[in-house]
Design a protein with these regions (language model features):
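Intrinsically disordered, low-complexity basic segments at termini and long loops, enriched
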Residues: 1-22
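Catalytic cores of secreted/periplasmic or lumenal enzymes
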Residues: 19-344
Length: 344
C-alpha cells in the first residue's frame, strides 16, 4: 500500500511536510498508530508561526497596529523604547505570550508588578490597538502578536531594520511577579548574561545583538547609580567608565536625588535606531554595568567591534535575533484574550 500525504503551507503552515509511506497491506490495528503519528505531525505544523497567519482572517492587522503605534510615538517619543523593552521582557519569561500585560488580582501579583517591570510603560498603546482590532476582527488577533508586531514597527520607524513578523502566538493565562527574577539585570556580568540567555536557547551573539536594542533606551538613576559612588573598596567609581562620563552622570544623579525622573539615555542618538550604542561602549560610556561589561570580555567584545564597523551587519543580526526571540513559545493551551489585561 502506498500512502501519500501532503500538508500545504496555505494558509496556516510555514512549511510543506510530505510523508511517504511504502508498505505492504497492514491490518487495522497496525494502521491506527500511523494515523495517530500523522495527527501529531499535523498538530505541530499547525502550531508554527508564520508571516501570513492573518491574511484571511484579519488582513488589516498590520495597518491598524502600525497606525496606532505611530500615533502614540508622535505624542510620546519614549514609546518606541518602551514597546521594544516590553517585547523583550514578555518573551524572556514564559515565552512570547503577553503575560506581561495581565493585571494583578487580589490573589496574584502579575509580572508587570515585579521589580524589573515596574518601570515598563506604554501598555495603553497595546490596549488601543487591541480595541481597534476587536472592532475590525473580533476574537482573532492575540495580544502577544500585537506586542511582536508593535516591536517591529517601532524599530523600523526609528530608522532600524524592518522584518516581517511571524504570527500565530496565543496569549498565556499565567503571570507571576516572582518569575521576573529570571530577567537579566543591569548589574549582571557577562557570564551571568550568557547563562541567562542560554537557558532560553539564545546564543552569545543573540545576547550582544539584542543588547543593541538599548540604542532606543533611557534609564533612571536607580539602575546605574551603584557604579557612581562607593563602587568597591578600591574605586569610588566603576573604573570601566569613562571619567568625564562618570562625572556627568553624578551631576544628573546627585545624592540625595529628589528628581525621580532623572536619568540618562543609553546612547547619544536615543531616538534613532543605529549602532551608536556599541560606539559608546568602546568609549567607556555604557550606562549599565551589564552593557559596559560586553567590551571587557573576549566572548562578547568582538561582536561589539564588528557592529561598530558595520551597521548593516548589526541590522541583519538584530533582525535574526528578534525573530529568534519572537519564536520563544508560551503555553500550548493559550487563548486569544478579548482584553489584554485579563484572561478570558
Amino acid at each position: 500500500m502506498h500512502l501519500f500525504m501532503k500538508f500545504s503551507s496555505k494558509p496556516h503552515f510555514q512549511s510543506t511536510i510530505i510523508l511517504i509511506y511504502q508498505m505492504a497491506p497492514l491490518p487495522a490495528e497496525n494502521i491506527l498508530p500511523i494515523i495517530f503519528l500523522l495527527l501529531i505531525i499535523f498538530s505541530v505544523s499547525k502550531a508554527e508561526l508564520h508571516a501570513h497567519y492573518y491574511d484571511q482572517t484579519c488582513p488589516q492587522v498590520e495597518k491598524i497596529i502600525s497606525e496606532t503605534v505611530l500615533k502614540a510615538s508622535k505624542h510620546d517619543p519614549k514609546v518606541p523604547a518602551r514597546i521594544l523593552r516590553m517585547f523583550f521582557h514578555d518573551c524572556f519569561i514564559r515565552g512570547c505570550d503577553a503575560s506581561i500585560l495581565l493585571d494583578s488580582t487580589a490573589t496574584n501579583q502579575a509580572e508587570k508588578d515585579g521589580p524589573p517591570n515596574i518601570s515598563v510603560r506604554s501598555f495603553y498603546v497595546i490596549d488601543e490597538a487591541k480595541a481597534k482590532l476587536e472592532l475590525a476582527c473580533p476574537r482573532t488577533v492575540s495580544c502577544a502578536d500585537i506586542i511582536a508586531i508593535s516591536a517591529s514597527n517601532v524599530v523600523a520607524m526609528s530608522g532600524g531594520p524592518y522584518w516581517n513578523v511571524l504570527k500565530g502566538r496565543k496569549d498565556g493565562r499565567v503571570s507571576k511577579a516572582s518569575d521576573t527574577i529570571n530577567l537579566p539585570a543591569p548589574t549582571s556580568n557577562v557570564s551571568q548574561l550568557i547563562q541567562s540567555f542560554a537557558k532560553r536557547g539564545l546564543t552569545v551573539k543573540d545576547l550582544v545583538t539584542l543588547s543593541g536594542g538599548h540604542t532606543l533606551g533611557f534609564s533612571h538613576c536607580s539602575s546605574f547609580e551603584a557604579r557612581l559612588r562607593n563602587f568597591s573598596s578600591l574605586h569610588d567609581t566603576d573604573p570601566s567608565m569613562n571619567t568625564e562620563f562618570a562625572l556627568d552622570l553624578r551631576k544628573k544623579c546627585p545624592k540625595p536625588n529628589h528628581n525621580h525622573n532623572a536619568g540618562q539615555f543609553l546612547d547619544s542618538t536615543a531616538s534613532v535606531f543605529d549602532n551608536d550604542y556599541y560606539k559608546q561602549l568602546l568609549a567607556g560610556k555604557g550606562v549599565f554595568f551589564s552593557d559596559q561589561s560586553l567590551v571587557g570580555d573576549h566572548r562578547t567584545r568582538w561582536f561589539v567591534e564588528a557592529f561598530v564597523k558595520d551597521q548593516s551587519l548589526f541590522f541583519k543580526e538584530f533582525t535574526a535575533s528578534m525573530l529568534k526571540l519572537g519564536n520563544l513559545r508560551g503555553s500550548r493551551n493559550g487563548e486569544v484574550r478579548l482584553n489584554c489585561r485579563i484572561v478570558n
